Amino acid sequence: SLTEQERAAQEAQRRKEAEARARELEERRRERALTARYPDKAAHDVERAAAIQLVDDVTATAEKRLVELTQQRKAFDVEMEFYKKDPSKAPMSLRRKIAENEESIAEQQRFIAGQDQEKRRVHQRFDVELAQLRKLWEAQRMPLPGATPASDAAAPAATR
């Protein structure tokens, strides 16, 4: 008969082992899902290209907006030429438009920088996945130790 402490220790050990088994099963499930989604490098490359294209499309839209804002700013600068000697005499509405334009330009630049970071994160995620997939693909190609190929196992049975 075990003491209360010993029973608690055994139960804790059993829980720990069960959690480890559950983690291992979850990891295997994730690996199977990954290899099912990406059966080869070409499939992985297609998915990477699609993810990068999404980021590039969003970036292109932001860059187009930045060009529009820059052109708008040039028009404001032409208007400001009339107040070159004393910019403080420029109408408040013009100064407000210039300030809003500058803020919009800065916002677009921050957004584009964020998209560049997102693109790096996407590449990094796919690089990590690819490293893991290479190991999994290699493991799929190599027979498990102790396992005999089906053709070898079937041959002796046919000769009996």
Region locations from a protein language model:
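Compositionally biased, proline/threonine/alanine/serine-rich low-complexity intrinsically disordered stretches
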Residues: 1-15, 127, 133-160
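Short, cationic interaction patches enriched in Lys/Arg with P/S/T/G and frequent prolines
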Residues: 1-46
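Surface-exposed, polar/charged faces of alpha-helical domains
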Residues: 36-135, 139-142, 146
